[in-house]
């Protein structure tokens, strides 16, 4: 698994339809599903730093993306 930075994760969230709803100590990103369910994840402001692996996997679960889906979003032009 390649390492992913906070900046890259943020870009993938934007491409997946998430929107920034709050930015204080951490950024809060949300996406409302057609069922009305809201997915939410918080990101650190540490743009260029790599996301630690356990935290990365927890964040993927929160946004319901697989590693392959995230990498595909990052490869989009």
Go through each PLM region and give its residues.
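Basic nucleic-acid-binding interfaces
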Residues: 1-77
């Amino acid at each position: 698994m390649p390492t992913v930075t906070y900046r890259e994760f943020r870009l993938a969230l934007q491409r997946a339809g998430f929107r920034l709803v709050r930015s204080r100590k951490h950024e809060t990103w949300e996406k409302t599903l057609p069922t009305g369910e809201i997915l939410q994840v918080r990101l650190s402001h540490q743009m260029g730093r790599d996301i630690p692996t356990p935290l990365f996997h927890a964040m993927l679960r929160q946004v319901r993306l697989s590693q392959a889906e995230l990498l595909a979003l990052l490869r989009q032009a």
